[in-house]
Amino acid sequence: MSTTEIEKVVKGASYSALLLNDCGLPITAANIAALFKTAKLNGHETTFKTFEDFLKTNPITNYIGAIGGSAPAAASSAPAKKEEPKKEEPKKEEPKEEETDMDMGDLFG
């Protein structure tokens, strides 16, 4: 078996494990083999058993979502603040002085 064939089997087993987990089925060598048979892929029972044994001690849910969680380098580390619409406060009306008709002459008596 060449390296590319081994890589295909490992990828297929990985995808099978993800699919079985997503469907809520146990990740066993028999279930992985059934998926390979359905997809008309060639694989070895030892590879399927290796995946089953590994995933018994290391649940696949530990690896889901753990990849690529970092932010781009250009992004700031602080979360962006949401701008809330400013509430306009009602303007207080200043008391108006009563307007009187005054002439300049009334000022001096």
Curated annotation (Swiss-Prot):
Source organism, top-level taxon: Eukaryota
Compositional bias annotation for Acidic residues: 96-109
3 X 5 AA tandem repeats of K-K-E-E-P: annotated span: 81-95
Gene3D superfamilies registered for this protein in UniProt: 1.10.10.1410
Keyword Aminoacyl-tRNA synthetase: no
GO biological process: cytoplasmic translation; translational elongation
Keywords: Repeat, Ribonucleoprotein, Ribosomal protein
Annotated stretches, region: Disordered: 71-109
Repeat (Sequence) residue spans along the chain: 81-85, 86-90, 91-95
PTM comment: Not phosphorylated.
Alphabetized GO MF terms: protein kinase activator activity; ribonucleoprotein complex binding; structural constituent of ribosome
Ranges of biased composition (kind: Basic and acidic residues): 80-95
Cellular compartments per GO CC: cytosolic large ribosomal subunit
Entry similarity comment: Belongs to the eukaryotic ribosomal protein P1/P2 family.
Name of this protein: Large ribosomal subunit protein P1
Species of origin: Tetrahymena thermophila
Name of the gene encoding the protein in the UniProt record: RPLP1
